Structures are given as C-alpha cells and as structure tokens.
Amino acid sequence: MVVHITTDNDIGVRITLRRMLLLTLVTYIVYIAYNQRDILHINRLAVLALSFVAYLAWESIGIQYSNFTLLNDWFQYTPGNAPIVLLLIILVITLLVYLTTTQRYITPNKWIALLMLVNLIGLILFPMVNDLIPLYVIIELQSYSLYLLTGVYNKSYNATRAAILYFVTGGIASVLILLSSAEVYEATGLTNLSEISTYYSISGINTWTSFDILLIALVFKMGLAPLHAWSISVYSYAPLYITAYISIVAKVSIMSFIYLNIHLFSTQLLILAFYLSVAVAAYTPLYQVNIKSILAYSGILNFGYLLTAVLTNDNAYYIYIIQYSLTHVTIFLCILAITEYTNKPASYWSPIVNVNQLVVPNKALCIALIVCLFSLIGIPPLPGFYGKYYIIVGLMSNGLNLEALTIIVFSVIATYYYAYIIKQLASNLYNNNTNVIATPINSTLGFIISILMVILITFYMYLPTLLDGLTLLHS
C-alpha cells in the first residue's frame, strides 16, 4: 500500500541514500583492484564514504511524512526504520575507524571493509522488507557476508572453525525461513507481508504457525536462547575485532524487523524466548572466565530484555537498542585498545581471551571500560539505567508485571559477572603492572573512545529530546 507523501525532497534524499551506498561499494571495489598495498587508505576511504551516507540518513529522518513502499512493494520505509538505519551506519563507521589505525597484533586485511559494506546493505534493507522473496534474499546477503567476515583471517584455525560453524548453523536457519515462506505461500498465494496480514485479518483464518517457524529461524539467527549455543562458540573462536562486529549488527537488524512486524508473530513464542534468554544469560556466565563468552552472554541477556519492548511495541525499544549498541561497541574498542599494552598475547588474532588479561597501565582507558560495565549493570545516571527503566515502565503500564519483575531479578544476578570484570579492572588503578608495554594509545582510537564516552555519560541530558523525537516519528 502506498501512502501519500508530503514532500518530494524526502523521497529524493532516501533514493540518494541508497544510490550513494551502492556507489560507495562500486568505488571501493575498483579502488581495491588498483591499490592493494595501502590498506589503511582503503579503510579510510570506506569511513569517509560511509560518513556521507550517514549524513544522508540523518537528513532523511523527517516527521512530516507517512510510510511509502519501494520496488513493487518489496520494501516499506516507515518512520520506525529511520533511527535503525542511522544507528547501523554509525556502528559500522565506529568499528571501521579502528582499521584506519596501526595495530600491533591484528594484520590489516583489504577485504574486511568491503565485506562490511556489503553486509551493511543487507543490514539496513532487512528491517524494511515487505515481501517474503526479498526477505530471504536480504537475510542471506547479510548472513553470507558475515560468514566470510568471520573467516577472513583464514590462517587462524579458530577463525576458520568459527566461520564453518557459523555457516552450518546459519544454513539451518535459512532452511527454516524457506520452509516458512513456502507454507505461507501455499496457504494464501501471497508473498507481500502487508497483503498477508490483511488476508488473515479479513478471513479470520488462524494459520500463524508458518510465521512461528519464521520467528524461530530469526531467533536462531540472533543466537537467543534456547538456540544460542552456536553463537557462544562462534564469538569465542572468532578474532577479537570480528567478534565486536558480528555480535551486534545482525542482532540489531533482525530484532528491528521483528519489532516493526510484531503483528505477524506469536507473542507466546517471544515471551518464551525472553524467559529462557534472561535465565540462561544471567546464570551461565557466573562460571566463565573467557571475556568474549561473558560479553556474548551479556548480549543474549540484553536482547532478551529487548524482546519485552518488542512485545509492548514501545518506544523504549529505540532507547535501549541505541544505548546498548553504543555501549557494546565502546567496550570492544576499549578491549582492543588494551591489547596494545599486552606483552604476552593469548594469540595473534585474539590477544586477550580471559578476564585476568585485562591489565592496562592507562587509567583513563580502565575507567572508561568500568563506566561501560556500570551502564550494563544499570547504574544511574548512565544510559543502561534509563534503558531498563523505560522498558520496565512500559511493561507495567501494559500489565506485564511478572516480566518486569523478571528483568529486575536477573539484572541483579548478572551484576555479579560484571562485577568480576570490574574487580580486575579496578586492580589496575592501584597496582603497578610490569607485564605490560608502556606505549601510548593510538590518538585516533583514543579520540573515538572519548567521543563515545561523552555520548554515554551525557545520555541523560539529551534523552528528553530523543524521546520527543521518537514520539513525533510515531505520531
């Protein structure tokens, strides 16, 4: 269904956004073909191009339009898409900036930025999908680029192992998506999601089982409980920098699709996934010492919280996913910065594996990481507190008091493994470490971490403006 649009400028900006992203990809491929040695310049080109794409995405956020469809109703752009598109572009830019600096342990690779650009196309298109055919094509676009990205350092045995495991488990989820799509088409003869929703509403036929299969496949893709075991292994085996990327971007894109199309899915399955995710992710890391495993379970826990915001279709979803995504990226950038001080790395691709390796003489960097962990715990006035607060308020206003109490209880339990990491970091503030290399942090990386910390610490100051903007977008 095509709805009227108030201005032609909005359409022009959005079409330009997509053309610019495709032009960036083509330009980047040509540049790589003729310049394969200076990888830092290649990565800087990607950052500059995506910065302009981010500017176009910002300009496309308007409050004076309703939704419209593109490419024969295959994609639907709504006000709810705009913040997610901008967030995904910012996440990719932030992680790409790290590749513009010289690192001690991670070897520069010319294919990483290219795979990220391809993946970004799938990431920003998936929440806009309005048809079963592009749904499968787009999710495979982002999935295959993630498989390749995971195994891009093919000299690492663990990286290759992670890529194969990711490919096999992702293939199982893809089969479930195809099965769901085939059953829906057999029952209705339709592939357009808007038309399918209207058909079910008018006919009164209760055949949502096919979409339940689709939901299970998407939960599988995100690595939420009870289909989470593969994700812990993949994130643990993958190189540290790759883990920082693959553990957040796909989840944001897929969860946003579920949030924007919640009317298609069973709330009972979402509630079940919520309870299992928070229970598993709050309890299991209490016995973990692997820093990537702990952060992987932390991701399951936080996206479990997000499932409740999806259930209530509340604007708290945007507040929580924005603050968690920025906190997640900041934590990994801090850990990557700490690797520059590591004298005895666990491996070349993942210098830091266990919590006791978080030894750093840079007290400012140590404090930044502690602040991020406090935010995950939910200490006010950090953004993690406001994210949980608005989710709990939304649950209670919808009569879901048990779910609100569950979030509070498991947040308290999860505090213990965050405190375990904080204890290790706090010891750096008082002890003189001799098993580290006293080298200054890269100025570019330090600047990015500083900017992110300012955004997180001052989150409460611009939160009212953010809430007003989200309210206007959905009014």
From Swiss-Prot:
What the entry lists under InterPro entries is as follows: ND/Mrp_TM (IPR001750)
Q: Which reaction does it catalyse?
A: a ubiquinone + NADH + 5 H(+)(in) = a ubiquinol + NAD(+) + 4 H(+)(out)
* UniProt protein name: NADH-ubiquinone oxidoreductase chain 2
In the UniProt record, what gene is named as encoding this protein? Answer: NAD2
Q: Which residues cross the membrane?
A: 45-65, 82-102, 112-132, 133-153, 162-182, 198-220, 240-260, 262-282, 291-311, 318-338, 365-385, 402-422, 447-467
Subcellular location(s) of the protein: Mitochondrion inner membrane
Tell me if Membrane is a UniProt keyword of this record.
yes
E.C. numbers? 7.1.1.2
Question: What are the alphabetically sorted keywords of the record?
Answer: Electron transport, Membrane, Mitochondrion, Mitochondrion inner membrane, NAD, Respiratory chain, Translocase, Transmembrane, Transmembrane helix, Transport, Ubiquinone
Provide the species name.
Answer: Candida albicans (strain SC5314 / ATCC MYA-2876) (Yeast)
Q: How does it sit in the membrane?
A: Multi-pass membrane protein
One Gene Ontology molecular-function label:
NADH dehydrogenase (ubiquinone) activity
> What does the sequence similarity comment in the record state about its family?
Belongs to the complex I subunit 2 family.
Q: Which GO terms describe its biological process?
A: mitochondrial electron transport, NADH to ubiquinone
What Pfam family is a match, any one?
Answer: Proton_antipo_M
Q: Name one GO cellular component term.
A: respiratory chain complex I
